Structures are given as structure tokens and as C-alpha cells.
Regions:
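N-proximal low-complexity "stem/linker" segments adjacent to membrane-targeting elements
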Residues: 1-34, 41
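Active-site-proximal specificity loops/subdomain of glycosyltransferases
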Residues: 3, 51-98, 103-119
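Catalytic-site signature of metal-activated, phosphate-bearing donor transferases
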Residues: 4, 108-289
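Structural motif
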Residues: 20-22, 47, 94
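Short acidic, S/G/P-rich loop/turn micro-motifs used as interaction or catalytic elements
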Residues: 30-31, 102-107, 136
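Short, acidic, metal-binding catalytic loop of nucleotide-sugar glycosyltransferases
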Residues: 38-48
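Short, high-confidence coil segments that cap the C-terminus of an alpha-helix
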Residues: 45, 91-92, 123-128
Length: 289
């Protein structure tokens, strides 16, 4: 169902959105829109919201099953504004957010759905989940100049690292159970990426509550939401497998002509399976065996 704006969608669908986990997809361009929306339906989100320009089209089957709203996706803080509006509308509900050509993976997602995972995560008294944005890229940029190919997607199997996250209010002391994570294309081609956008950590899954606010760096106003685990043991982490950085590097005139391939000696074909991500240490099951 299509709505003229996100506020109209929320007003019309508020009761519906309260019945199950919600995925919010911000559609920045016309690349892999349908596959992104279908993927998040298939892994178990009850409601998928597509925020997109009016001129973009969807296949009929997707158009009938997602909640579409016309939205200024290029406006300042477009994602933060949208997520905060949805947060205020569905207190207590789990919400996920991503961009088009991004795909959420979590441990055992081939045999367990997102509602099962979130139920377990809730039982562990967690209200948010850390994910790493894992860059995907086509192996042959001459054949796929926008760097996007589902059938020939590759990822970096190493080259990831973490640094302590400084608490500026405490003189730069490390924040408890918070780290800044780096790697992938934003690390290998960092000269083309603004410093503030080099992190690959995101808190894309969270439980909505009154007054909560998503910030521009993909962290929340409640610091506990930004932690990678509870104090007593490790928790589930997820991965967002994303073509977004590769697309940007091959679209931006400042980097387009400097990059002829994204492949290097640590590239590996992406298998589109959670087992590969677990084996590479790019997410973990915590206590969810």
C-alpha cells in the first residue's frame, strides 16, 4: 500500500505496525530495491516500510506486500528522521533499518526467523543489537560498473579491527562495552571516505521506546543501546551485507576513476549464507546455539 508521506503511513498503519517487528528501508537509488525488500520479508519481518522517491517503481508482488511512503531520501538526516518517527509510533516494538542493496544476516537465519532471534534477545534483557556492515562488491567492475552483482558478489575475509570508543564527557576514557569497528572498503580506500563515515558498526535492530533518538553516527541517545554485549556474557551480533559503499565509491567522481577493481588477495566470493559470516568472525551467536 502506498502513502503520500511517512507521517501519513504512520497515521494510517499505527495499529498494524504495533503487531510485529518492522523493517524500514530507505531507498536511495533504483539498485536492487525489490531484492532488498523481499529479503527482509523472507527472514521474518512482519512489516517492511519502503521510503522512496515517487518516481521509483516496484514489481507488483512487492508493491502489494510492503508499506510504501513517498519520502525525501536525499534530505538532511533522512534516515535518522525516519527512524525516530517510526520509533515514536511503535513503543515496545522491534525496529530494523537499512538502505537498499543491504541485506541483514544473523546466526542461523536460514532455519530461524528474525522473530525467533529477537524473542531470545529480549529474554536476555537486550533492547538493541550490534551489527557490522560488511561491504559487498562485484568482482569485475568492467562488467558491473556500479559494483553491484548478486551472483558475483565478493567480500573481504580479513582486515577488520576495533578501537576503544572514547567518552568525551569523561576526558576521553573508553566507554564501557562500546567499540568503534573498521574494515572493508572504507578501510582499504579510506582516502576517499570522510573520517566520520569510516566506521562499520551500526545498531540497526532496536526496541522502540519513548524519547529514544537515532544519531547521525548510527548510535542511539541511550548509551546502553550502543553496547555490543551485556555485562555478564556475549550476545548475538548480526551482519548487514551491503553494496552501499562500493556503489558510492564507483559513483563519486572523486573516486570513480581511481578504482579499477575492489578485489585483493583477501577477497572471497560471498556465499549468501550465515555460516560463512560466522566462520569469518563477522557475527556471533552469543548464547543462541
Amino acid at each position: 500500500m502506498a502513502h503520500p508521506s511517512l507521517t501519513d503511513l504512520i497515521a494510517a498503519e499505527r495499529d498494524t505496525l504495533a503487531t510485529g517487528p518492522v523493517a524500514v528501508v530507505l531507498v536511495e537509488d533504483d539498485v536492487e530495491i525489490a531484492t532488498t525488500l523481499r529479503h527482509h520479508q523472507q527472514i521474518g519481518f512482519d512489516h517492511v516500510i519502503a521510503l522512496m522517491p515517487e518516481e521509483f517503481t516496484l514489481p507488483a508482488d512487492v508493491e502489494q506486500t510492503v508499506l510504501r511512503a513517498t519520502y525525501d531520501v536525499y534530505g538532511p538526516q533522512a534516515m535518522e528522521t525516519a527512524v525516530n518517527l517510526v520509533n515514536d509510533a511503535v513503543p515496545g516494538q522491534w525496529v530494523f533499518y537499512c538502505f537498499n542493496a543491504e541485506y541483514l544476516f544473523f546466526p542461523f537465519c536460514e532455519t530461524r526467523n528474525v522473530k525467533e532471534m529477537l524473542a531470545f534477545h529480549t529474554e536476555e534483557r537486550r533492547h538493541a543489537m550490534l551489527a557490522y556492515v560488511i561491504d559487498l562488491y562485484a568482482d569485475d567492475l568492467s562488467q558491473y560498473p556500479d559494483a553491484v552483482s548478486l551472483d558475483h558478489a565478493h567480500l573481504d575475509r580479513s582486515g577488520y579491527y576495533a578501537l576503544a570508543r572514547a567518552d568525551l564527557e569523561r576526558g576521553g576514557e573508553p566507554k564501557e562495552r562500546q567499540l568503534d569497528f573498521f574494515g572493508g572498503l572504507r578501510w582499504r580506500f579510506e582516502e576517499h571516505v570522510p573520517t566520520a563515515r569510516r566506521k562499520i558498526d551500526r545498531i540497526p535492530l532496536f526496541r522502540a521506546k519513548k524519547g529514544l533518538r537515532l544519531r547521525e553516527d548510527h548510535t542511539f541517545s541511550d548509551e546502553e543501546y550502543n553496547t555490543y554485549a551485556c555485562p555478564w556474557h556475549h550476545n548475538i551480533t548480526a551482519a548487514i551485507c551491503s553494496f552501499r559503499t562500493a556503489k558510492a565509491l564507483k559513483t563519486n567522481p572523486g573516486s570513480r576513476y581511481d578504482i579499477h577493481t575492489f578485489k585483493w588477495h583477501n577477497s572471497a566470493p560471498f556465499e549468501w549464507h550465515s555460516r560463512q559470516l560466522l566462520d569469518l568472525g563477522l557475527m556471533e551467536p552469543g548464547q543462541w546455539f
